[in-house]
């Protein structure tokens, strides 16, 4: 008979499956509470690492349409429900599993595709979204930077060929503009004096 607590737990796990773009099933036998807390911190806010009951998880997975965990729910089980960057979360999990042999990555899924443990490790080996975006930005920025260098080189070449008169004329033009501004400023000051006579 389903108790309200179990129904609520199934609903929560089902919701976690539906809201996640990826999930990784782990066995955490032998990890301390402090180690689990450390793992949760390393996963960040976009990943929920939850210790779950196998029978309730099987029901929730079926309700959510997740088949990746069929036959894998045995032993002390925890699931990383990933709502953000799946690569970064998979990397955090695999790094933690390397440092703490008690955490065993069993299986997972990413965007609806079932992953075995080696595929989760392969996902972790990919570059993070931020690094990929930085590379794209660099590729997009490179032509503009190259064009700026070419234009600057052409400007320098023209200045060398013309003996740099363009650079010498610019200060002279500024001086004549300053002289005109000073003359304009002095003229109104003298005009009222002339009216008094």
From Swiss-Prot:
GO terms for cellular component: large ribosomal subunit. Pfam families: Ribosomal_L10. Transmembrane segments: none annotated. It comes from Pseudarthrobacter chlorophenolicus (strain ATCC 700700 / DSM 12829 / CIP 107037 / JCM 12360 / KCTC 9906 / NCIMB 13794 / A6) (Arthrobacter chlorophenolicus). Keywords: Ribonucleoprotein, Ribosomal protein, RNA-binding, rRNA-binding. PROSITE patterns: RIBOSOMAL_L10. Forms part of the ribosomal stalk, playing a central role in the interaction of the ribosome with GTP-bound translation factors. Residues 163-197 are annotated as: Disordered. One of its GO terms (biological process) is translation. One of its GO terms (molecular function) is large ribosomal subunit rRNA binding. Belongs to the universal ribosomal protein uL10 family. This is Large ribosomal subunit protein uL10. Part of the ribosomal stalk of the 50S ribosomal subunit. The N-terminus interacts with L11 and the large rRNA to form the base of the stalk. The C-terminus forms an elongated spine to which L12 dimers bind in a sequential fashion forming a multimeric L10(L12)X complex.
């Amino acid at each position: 008979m389903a108790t309200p607590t179990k129904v609520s737990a199934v609903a929560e796990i089902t919701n976690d499956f539906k809201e996640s773009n990826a999930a990784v099933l782990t066995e955490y036998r032998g990890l301390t509470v402090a180690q689990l807390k450390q793992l949760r911190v390393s996963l960040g806010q976009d990943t929920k690492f939850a210790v779950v009951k196998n029978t309730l998880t099987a029901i929730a997975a079926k309700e959510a349409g997740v088949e990746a965990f069929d036959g894998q729910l045995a032993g002390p089980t925890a699931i990383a429900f990933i709502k953000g960057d799946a690569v970064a979360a998979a990397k955090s999990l695999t790094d933690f599993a390397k440092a703490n042999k008690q955490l065993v990555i069993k299986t997972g899924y990413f965007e609806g595709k079932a992953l075995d443990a080696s595929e989760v490790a392969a996902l972790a080996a990919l570059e993070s979204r931020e690094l990929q975006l930085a590379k794209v930005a660099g590729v997009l920025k490179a032509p503009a930077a190259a064009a700026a260098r070419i234009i600057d080189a052409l400007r320098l070449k023209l200045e060398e060929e013309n003996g740099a008169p363009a650079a010498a004329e610019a200060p002279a033009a500024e001086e004549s503009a300053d002289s005109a501004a000073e003359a304009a400023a002095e003229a109104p000051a003298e005009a009222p004096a002339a009216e008094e006579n």
